[in-house]
Amino acid sequence: MVNIAGPPPREVLEGPILAVSRQTKANIPGAPERKSFAKITEPIEVPGLLDIQLNSFAWLIGTPEWRARQQEELGDSVRVTSGLEDILEELSPIQDYSGNMSLSLSEPRFEDMKNTIDECKDKDINYSAPLYVTAEFINNETQEIKSQTVFIGDFPMMTDKGTFIVNGTERVVVSQLVRSPGVYFDQTIDKSTERPLHSVKVIPSRGAWLEFDVDKRDTVGVRIDRKRRQPVTVLLKALGWTTEQITERFGFSEIMMSTLESDGVSNTDEALLEIYRKQRPGEQPTRDLAQSLLDNSFFRAKRYDLAKVGRYKVNRKLGLGGDNEGLMTLTEEDIATTLEYLVRLHAGETTMTSPTGEVIPVETDDIDHFGNRRLRTVGELIQNQVRVGLSRMERVVRERMTTQDAESITPTSLINVRPVSAAIREFFGTSQLSQFMDQNNSLSGLTHKRRLSALGPGGLSRERAGIEVRDVHASHYGRMCPIETPEGPNIGLIGSLASYARVNAFGFIETPYRKVENGVLTDQIDYLTADEEDRFVVAQANVEHDADGKITADSVTVRVKNGDIQVVAPESVDYLDVSPRQMVSVATAMIPFLEHDDANRALMGANMQRQAVPLVRSEAPFVGTGMERAAAYDAGDLIINKKGGVVENVSADIITVMADDGTRETYILRKFERTNQGTCYNQTPLVNIGDRVEAGQVLADGPGTHNGEMSLGRNLLVAFMPWEGHNYEDAIILNQRVVEEDILTSIHIEEHEIDARDTKLGPEEITREIPNVSEDVLKDLDERGIVRIGADVRDGDILVGKVTPKGETELTPEERLLRAIFGEKAREVRDTSMKVPHGETGKVIGVRRFSRDDDDDLAPGVNEMIRVYVAQKRKIQDGDKLAGRHGNKGVVGKILPQEDMPFMPDGTPVDIILNTHGVPRRMNIGQVLEVHLGWLAAAGWKIDTEDPANAELLKTLPEDLYDVPAGSLTATPVFDGATNEEIAGLLGNSRPNRDGDVMVDENGKATLFDGRSGEPFPYPVSVGYMYILKLHHLVDEKIHARSTGPYSMITQQPLGGKAQFGGQRFGEMEVWAMQAYGAAYTLQELLTIKSDDVVGRVKVYEAIVKGENIPDPGIPESFKVLLKELQSLCLNVEVLSADGTPMELSGSDDDEFDQAGASLGINLSRDERSDADIA
């Protein structure tokens, strides 16, 4: 079997080796070490951040690496099966209706991929490998066995970055959070009696729900598959229990005994018929039908499946032991124990003895607890689709077994693979969980792959989800981030996996804890699920301990069950968090001083980092958190060296390394490619020829990374002060230097595609010969009619010339005769060239041509397809949105000349002015601390160890932070960063500039001077470096204006929105405003000739062109629509003229309107449809 697209080589992905390779990342040439303020040493590294995707897919297809890992963990005695093997085993054998013939499928295997990832993107096809299975047909009558290898279809493969290529675009399959199969006990309060009533649901992975409940009359009832309720003893009797057996098992319960007395059935047959009547009302019941209905509902594996996770949950909840682990259907013992649990819960008991003798707690379940919610990861989601496809195929196989001749049947003649490939294709193309990958920057892609969604098939819907399911739960700790979730209708339904979390075999999220024994920390790390964690006492990572790991504090604050906080002795602690950042996601862990930010703003900060566009020059933040390197490393956008060796060759697009073992590794860099979001994907080398490189070292940066660290923005010198009202309400004032030096400049690439098709009137043609177009317009087109690379284009310019045959009018017999004698005249064609869309400019950086003549695979009816890539360099400008990492966002309100900006005592002008009002009420104080530490990192500091005033400071800081040079990078990890006292102390010890002056005092403030007058401002101002991101909300993509354009077919009013080239809506309230000002003529103009007076607007255009006065408006179309609406309600409404005669409002002026348009040579409606559609 060929290893395809499983996880990357193990040294990059696995635990301890990963930790080693992370250490080597510090040795990147030119990569400075971050000075960390962390006090806590983490016992383990952050695990592979893409493992949730890669491991799940590796399980599905059973890669050799995955099998080796499983064998290592489970031992050789346990058989390891992949997800595809499981599903084929579950399906096989498929038997015909008589049981004489059977077909078994096994041994799925993959052949080599047909295309590389780049070829798939280029040709708009799927990145997939052919899947084959061994099909074995057995004729039980003749004992004949026929075995064949059958091609099932092309199976989409995961790239080593955890994505899929579907139809040439990169997609991500998001993990789904669903309620786990199992048994759930619930309590509700009866409104009339105010007594607690209890119920239980047995929820399978597939099949009928079984619900028991106690009602206010104290009878125990059952509902099968949400049908009508009946006494529970009817079900027990239908299962073959006698009254004596029921009394023996449930005699302790009065409510069960009273239910038994009043159930109205005396034996098994009556009970079965009673159940059948309730389940299938209106049908004539028989004993056999009733028996098979009950068996099919709960005891047949084809119809009822608890799944491994469901069996595990049932056994765990009811204390049933592991004897029935392989059984995926319900047993009578399951049902009886569930009932016993329910009646004891209703009676108020707190414990019970299970059938295996185990004492188990009796309590209701919290459905929002992460012990009761599990993840369907990518492998399981695809497996479910394969199951759907195979079950559809199974029906076809059965039918063919009965219709074909038994002698001539072969496995290939029975199998129709279309349903399987259709189910897989449908999932990747249309499922809510298969999403267009967010490639805005490296972080957004990484976060997308780690996303957890409660939406989708089998999950919740936005409308039905209440507050409880969206809320943060104590069991999310270390599993799902409490901060990172969208604002808006999906809040709380979409989350992000926490930094250290992993998913176990059952789909439950586990988080690591460090074992504590008798108050002493050990090196043992245990991964616990949420319900396992409830049994232990867990302390925070910042517990004080000595060098031997013994906890020194007299008492420790801990978490116990349900997230309650207690203070206990060190000996009572079972576990310790492995890291302070364990509870938050990757994006949240990249917010410095997170502990000083309000949660709402931190949420915005985490989300806005994903919207940052990669800049032309990336710069690592002065103030980081230590997560930047791990995030960039695992995001998959860096080029990482596989083997130690020496760099042999470096260019902009290729790096060659001669490895120590004599092999040569070549790495190809991706240059100026377009991402899904239109940002620029570019990789740049970090090494030089002759450099020694180790395995795991970064060779090249990707977009938005710098020296192997995630670098989404730039460090700018910021001053917190109001300035002439220009930064009122979160507006931002920028220095012109930022524009001139391309500090916040980004490159955006747009793709334009056109195809030449066969039409009814003949084929379209890509050509330079375009009718009625001057040579000046064609200057940048080559001889084929395609724009040259390097051409500067703007809106309206032709990118690809194309002509489409025009429909010819019916010829008279005389004309036909003349045509036959003198031959064809030049065919009539019209210009349908591809032009640069409105509002876009840029430089052509790439052209791809696909043609049927070159054997390219094109859609039916398409002869040629051209793709043109236009790149645009966007400098920062008024109206662009900027943000920090703390949810502090704003729009550029003014760009000031450098000489007008406030400047520091040494003459340095600040880069950006933020308003102070943006801080206090939003409670994101982290940004202020970031500014102070940013200044320190840029200026450097040196602590005078002899000065007694620094004694406290020296105690808290490690030695490598005593003397730090200017321009250093610092790390302040979340919940374990620099304290206020440390920052204040360091500000008092910051290094002076070259003139020997300290610019910023110990309060973090400086005296600023007004750039216009040179006078100092009256108060000191907080100044320092803040990391600023440029977000994707760019004014270039939002600004829009329309003169003429398309109109709605019904109302004849202009369309709305930039995409439709629409107009501005002049709504009801705007009309009131015009009325209030008495602007009658302006209002009339807005409601008629500028909107839906069809004839009037053409006449106005004509008047403007000819320089005449504007004519009077006519009747708007919407008035005619209103009349027709009233007439359709049988109300005879007429319009009377001034003299009382009825007026005709039909389109009598249409001819005049057409003539006016034709005479002016205009098409006022600017029909935006593609010309191919018209043809």
Curated annotation (Swiss-Prot):
GO terms for cellular component: DNA-directed RNA polymerase complex. The lineage of its organism: Bacteria, Bacillati, Actinomycetota, Actinomycetes, Mycobacteriales. Keywords: DNA-directed RNA polymerase, Nucleotidyltransferase, Transcription, Transferase. The RNAP catalytic core consists of 2 alpha, 1 beta, 1 beta' and 1 omega subunit. When a sigma factor is associated with the core the holoenzyme is formed, which can initiate transcription. This is DNA-directed RNA polymerase subunit beta. InterPro entries: DNA-dir_RNA_pol_bsu_ext_1_sf, DNA-dir_RNA_pol_bsu_external_1, DNA-dir_RNA_pol_su2, DNA-dir_RNAP_su2_dom, DNA-dir_RNAP_su2_hyb_sf, RNA_pol_bsu_bac, RNA_pol_bsu_CS, RNA_pol_bsu_protrusion. The keyword Nucleotidyltransferase applies. Residues 1165-1175 have a biased composition (Basic and acidic residues). Pfam families: RNA_pol_Rpb2_1 (PF04563), RNA_pol_Rpb2_2 (PF04561), RNA_pol_Rpb2_3 (PF04565), RNA_pol_Rpb2_45 (PF10385), RNA_pol_Rpb2_6 (PF00562), RNA_pol_Rpb2_7 (PF04560).
